A protein has these predicted regions:
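Accessory alpha-helical/coil subdomains and C-terminal extensions
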Residues: 1-84
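C-terminal non-catalytic interaction/assembly regions of soluble proteins
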Residues: 52-175
């Protein structure tokens, strides 16, 4: 049975500081530790990102970054607990040696198809991984129009989120 993460803070759910701290205390009381995963896109009850900066991306969206130190500071100040945070995108960039074979196959196929599309003159598309039907994992690469991807977001279905809003449920894990 999976143990961690114990709390997952999702952008689909408004961050509730009190609920977050109470859940953290409860998990620590039970297990002696608590692992938290947080999206940079989580917002407070005023609709502001917890980690928003003044910098904007190419689409005019707020540049995010800093939710981990924000939560770390909150836990330190409110719960008086030592804690550690890490930004996982650094791990992805520096740990190719522990990538799964599937990840490597996906990366190579996406890159090869991007080159193939460019050489053949396809514009306004990007390669995407399309999962096959059935229990056995199969996949293929297809072109997708950038107009259906760029500057859009796909939200996690509410049916995948626990009632307390602090994790994903079995349906999310199994799908």
């Amino acid at each position: 049975k999976r143990d961690a993460p114990h709390i997952i803070l999702l952008p689909e759910i408004i961050f509730n500081q009190k609920k977050f701290l109470l859940k953290g205390q409860d998990v620590i009381a039970q297990k002696g530790y608590c692992v938290i995963v947080a999206s940079e896109g989580i917002k407070n009850n005023k609709g502001n990102f917890l980690s928003e900066s003044d910098t904007k991306d190419a689409f005019g969206h707020a540049q995010l970054g800093g939710v981990a130190p924000y939560l770390s500071s909150l836990v330190s100040k409110k719960l008086k607990l030592k804690n550690h945070w890490a930004v996982s995108d650094y791990l992805q960039r520096s740990a190719r040696h522990i990538a799964s074979n599937t990840d490597l196959l996906h990366a190579e196929a996406v890159g090869a198809h991007a080159i193939k599309y460019a050489i053949s003159g396809m514009n306004g598309v990007m390669p995407i991984i399309v999962r096959g039907k059935g229990k056995k994992y199969t996949w293929k690469i297809e072109p997708a129009p950038l107009s259906k991807i760029a500057n859009l977001e796909k939200k996690l279905p509410k049916t995948f989120i626990t009632k307390d809003g602090l994790n994903v449920n079995k349906q999310a894990i199994d799908s």
